[in-house]
DNA sequence: ATGACTTTAGAACGATCGTTCTGTAAATAA
DNA sequence: TTATTTACAGAACGATCGTTCTAAAGTCAT
């Protein structure tokens, strides 16, 4: 069944621009009008493809995170040591920033006006990256590279730091930011205590 | 010269509630109406004390950060080693969270509609805490406790992590969050590599 | 008590918000 | 070709936004 309409493409463009705007300006700070202008389609047409603003964001976040997880699963086997995986992850997070959407998800979830089912879905968002981080740390324990007493806490802090660094993607020079991503892994690995 | 008017008090109440709301819901997500309801004063009255929403936020951020800096300067001498200072700082940041306002400041500064002078002022916000962190690390180097090749980067990452942890103040249980603050210092100090 | 000034509430404004409705040109099916 | 469905634009809606205006009540000096 061939389609000559190219509605899917339009939907993709709207989704892409919306994700960008949400990442930069937050949920409340991004209007449908903004999305309309950035995508080049009318405001009314955004509603042809997406039920409302909240559902649009949830779709973006869920789909983005799913794609993120799949992409990481694809490249992860290329790195053999836990140490390498950790450095690779830091670069991966920087170049495939779904994490701003995580923060925006927190913003939405914190708003009392947000529907409970949406909040529920948003809380599940962080599971994908956290699981990926946790897997690396566990792998490092198994290979004897790492010594970690509190896996969950370590995972959480690592994710928190990487996520926070992503906030600077739109404002900081790429090379400098990349250095900071590397350095956070360095710090996690070795600390600063004199030995 | 005694004053029987107590306008200063209402101004303080409005400022306090506004800071709380901005921290929780962000700049765009907080309306003057919200602030009016939370403080118990009319919407118009908010404008009697503050010129507009933007100026209100800038005042809150600047004043809050100034108070934060003074308070830390007051307690800092109680801790003798750099290590102790670092742990003390993590607790201090958690209990005197001005850092959510830092994030909201980023949100405001990222918005093209924000006036340039406001953006300028907001960029200066992070200087106070960063200087405080940097002082601790430098102190640790001087006492021989720490070995740090990139002071600025280390400072930035430490501030980033603490700031990000503050985001969970309204959603996470206090004791658990406190554990994470402690643990981030642990990690910065020692890392996870097996020795 | 009177008049000046400060502090407050509340109505009102235009702009913009998220959303819905209406109309229409293009694509497909008959 | 005609009828139906799909893909869009754009006007319009009520609600809420940040902000301003009006006016009354409270406080103070005289």
Language-model features: locations:
Chain A
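C-terminal peripheral helix-coil segments that are non-catalytic and often amphipathic
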Residues: 1, 91-92, 131-143, 159-160, ...
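Basic, helix-initiating cap at the start of DNA-binding domains
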Residues: 1-25, 30-41, 55
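Short hydrophobic/aromatic patch on the recognition helix
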Residues: 39-50
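Hydrophobic alpha-helical connector segments
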Residues: 59, 63, 70-99, 154-158
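Amphipathic alpha-helical packing segments from all-alpha helical-bundle domains
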Residues: 66-69, 73, 99, 116-143, ...
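Amphipathic alpha-helical segments used for helix-helix packing
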Residues: 96-117, 170-171
């Amino acid at each position: 069944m061939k389609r000559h309409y190219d509605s899917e493409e339009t939907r993709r463009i709207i989704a892409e621009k919306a994700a960008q705007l949400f990442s930069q300006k937050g949920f409340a700070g991004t209007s449908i009008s903004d999305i309309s202008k950035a995508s080049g389609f009318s405001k009314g047409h955004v509603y042809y493809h997406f039920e409302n603003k909240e559902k649009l964001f949830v779709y973006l976040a869920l789909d983005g995170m799913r794609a993120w997880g799949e992409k990481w699963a694809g490249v992860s086997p290329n790195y053999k040591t836990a140490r390498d995986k950790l450095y690779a992850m830091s670069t991966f997070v920087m170049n495939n920033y779904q994490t701003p959407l995580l923060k925006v998800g927190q913003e939405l979830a914190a708003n009392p006006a947000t529907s409970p089912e949406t909040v529920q879905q948003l809380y599940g968002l962080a599971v994908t990256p956290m699981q990926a981080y946790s897997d690396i740390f566990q792998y490092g324990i198994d290979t004897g590279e790492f010594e970690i007493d509190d896996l969950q806490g370590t995972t959480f802090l690592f994710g928190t730091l990487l996520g926070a660094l992503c906030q600077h993607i739109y404002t900081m020079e790429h090379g400098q930011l990349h250095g900071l991503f590397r350095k956070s892994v360095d710090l996690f690995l070795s600390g600063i205590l004199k030995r």
